[in-house]
């Protein structure tokens, strides 16, 4: 079922009556307004200009063909992502996915039934065949934030969203607070391709909420490429900008513990 299909539009209409649409950045009620005027200045200030590609001297990209993020992980952008992850706000994740489609891929966003809808761009011509969200724990929140962000992106790029392609291979510690080398070791071997037929020979667009060091995206890319993907490019709503990092020279060792 397409994300913007008629049944889902009807369900959204009911939701709008019970839970009015809110700004993903400040949580103010928006209704049918396209963007929040109160957040416009800060949102623009947090955009990464002029380019959104990540620098390999600042992030570990591993086997990725590249990575991009339109925002710095600060201020209202950081609060929006944390709200989507920890405050039971899946529609915040969807709204951020719409913004990602617009800023990263040039999709024009129009209002339809009081909802922002990204218009189609040719995803295959941009070099992608499918979209794969980074697996994340959904047991407590009931949904996967990168998957929700990827839904409007898949619609805008007219690409299949392969939610069953990639999954956890083992439990791991949380990445937050770990130094760079420990982040790499923590996610090494943490992901596996659950159905190789979904990605074999395909150019994968990997979607995450935040790219910090790049360790998680690189670990996902390693799993996808090992299973036959032709290439993997990562995109996220935001990234943390670091000074140049020293790239690892030793093989990564698996280190299992907690949960994804």
Residue spans of the language-model regions?
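Glycine-rich phosphate/pyrophosphate-handling loop used in enzymes and phosphotransfer proteins
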Residues: 1-207, 212-260
């Amino acid at each position: 079922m397409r994300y913007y299909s008629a049944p889902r539009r009807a369900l959204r209409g009911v939701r709008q009556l019970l839970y009015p649409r809110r700004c993903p950045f400040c949580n103010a009620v928006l209704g049918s307004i396209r963007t929040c005027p109160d957040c416009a200045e800060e949102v623009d200030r947090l955009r990464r200009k002029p380019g959104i590609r990540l620098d390999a001297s600042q992030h570990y990209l591993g086997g990725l063909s590249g990575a991009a993020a339109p925002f710095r992980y600060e201020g209202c952008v950081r609060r929006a992502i944390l709200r989507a992850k920890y405050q039971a706000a899946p529609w915040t994740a969807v709204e951020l996915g719409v913004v990602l489609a617009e800023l990263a891929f040039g999709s024009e966003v129009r209002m339809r039934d009081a909802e922002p809808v990204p218009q189609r761009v040719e995803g295959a011509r941009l070099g992608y065949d499918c979209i794969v969200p980074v697996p994340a724990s959904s047991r407590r929140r009931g949904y996967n934030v990168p998957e929700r962000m990827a839904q409007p992106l898949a619609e805008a790029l007219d690409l299949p969203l392969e939610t069953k392609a990639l999954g956890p291979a083992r439990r791991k510690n949380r990445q937050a607070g770990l130094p760079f080398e420990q982040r790499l070791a923590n996610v090494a071997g943490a992901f596996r391709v659950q159905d190789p037929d979904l990605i074999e020979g395909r150019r994968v667009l990997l979607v995450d909420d935040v790219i910090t060091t790049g360790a998680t995206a690189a670990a996902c890319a390693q799993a996808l490429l090992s299973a036959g993907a032709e290439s993997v490019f990562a995109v996220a709503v935001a990234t943390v900008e670091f000074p140049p990092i020293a790239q690892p020279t030793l093989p990564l060792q698996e280190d299992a513990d907690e949960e994804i």
